[in-house]
């Protein structure tokens, strides 16, 4: 049975106003996923994690943490990556850079709350590959399009990635790109009962989330 060794590093940055932001992924409506029959399906390693990093906008403040990969698969056909899905357990989100247990617990509860990822109602998030286009003569990277689902909201995102499929493994590396978290409802004032103060707090956190993905699949 073939095994997949997956290492995913998703650096999420709520970048400060003075920081140079990464290129923004093209975001649109969710796209239809077409099944690719006849290929090889490989299960993701259960020990994989997602790393995150967040910033405030107007002050120098950041935090780091991880989210566990719950399950998923990759699909390979004729030597190419043609599909796949990664499901993340949002209830597992933790902060790793705060030593004080009380402060760390407060942040983790806040991230799991309705203000952000609302894990009681939406315990998982997922990225499902729709299409992988080979690089052209003018482009170094492949172009990857997939459906990203957070808080039950699905949007398509398109970004460049270095995809290498060999007899030994599959390597997937996406240079840092950003998305707007508010398009997935991750904002204080998404609640009907949100106060003006809560809405102002959301403006202290940059709406751009920067993502960096590295995946290695060993056959």
Regions found by a protein language model. Give the residues of each.
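Low-complexity, acidic/polar, glycine-enriched regions of mature
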Residues: 17-219
């Amino acid at each position: 049975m073939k095994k997949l060794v997956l290492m995913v590093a998703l650096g999420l940055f709520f970048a400060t106003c003075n920081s140079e932001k990464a290129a923004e992924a093209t975001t649109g409506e969710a796209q239809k996923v077409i099944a690719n029959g006849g290929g090889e399906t490989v299960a993701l390693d259960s020990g994989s994690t997602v790393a995150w990093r967040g910033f405030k906008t107007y002050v120098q403040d950041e935090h780091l943490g991880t989210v566990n990969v719950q399950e998923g698969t990759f699909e390979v056909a004729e030597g190419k990556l043609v599909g796949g899905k990664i499901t993340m357990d949002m209830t597992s989100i933790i902060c790793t850079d705060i030593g004080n247990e009380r402060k760390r617990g407060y942040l983790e509860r806040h991230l799991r709350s309705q203000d952000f990822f609302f894990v009681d109602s939406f315990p998982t998030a997922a990225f499902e590959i729709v299409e992988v286009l080979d690089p052209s003569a003018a482009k170094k990277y492949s172009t990857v399009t997939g459906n990203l689902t957070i808080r039950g909201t699905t949007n398509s995102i398109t970004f460049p990635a270095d995809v290498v499929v060999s007899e030994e493994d599959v390597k997937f590396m996406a240079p840092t790109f950003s998305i707007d978290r508010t398009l997935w409802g991750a904002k204080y004032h998404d609640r009907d009962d949100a106060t003006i103060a809560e809405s102002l707090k959301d403006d202290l956190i940059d709406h751009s989330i920067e993502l960096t993905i590295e995946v290695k699949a060993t056959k």
